[in-house]
Amino acid sequence: MPDRSYILRESTVAFSKNVIEFCKQEKLTAVNRPIIDQLLRSATSIGANYAEADNAGSRTDFRNKIFIAKKEAAETKYWLNLMLDLTANPVACQRLLTDFHHILMTLQKVVNTLANRSQSAAKHTANR
């Protein structure tokens, strides 16, 4: 069974590609152009930051990149929700939101694990 790291890496790459394809299909207007630009930036940044985290040289660097990836995910959700009302293809946009939700849940699990480890380490240090 593939580990969570591999699954998240592959999921973020696939998600980025799907967002790119979705945006390429959209007819650009004065209204949706800035939203599409922001969506492309934030959606592809999730995977880029996760890739950096996965290759981090320290736990602190890993933690920082994971938190950045999660922030980019929150921004991506915002832009996808706006696009849902603007797109001529709401089914494709909803599919992206569904895929996104799985990525967000996995990132949240990583963040929770980091928080739990940090709390355990703090308790261990305090008990010395």
Identify the meaning behind each predicted range.
Residues 1-128:
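Short, C-terminally biased terminal segments at protein or domain edges
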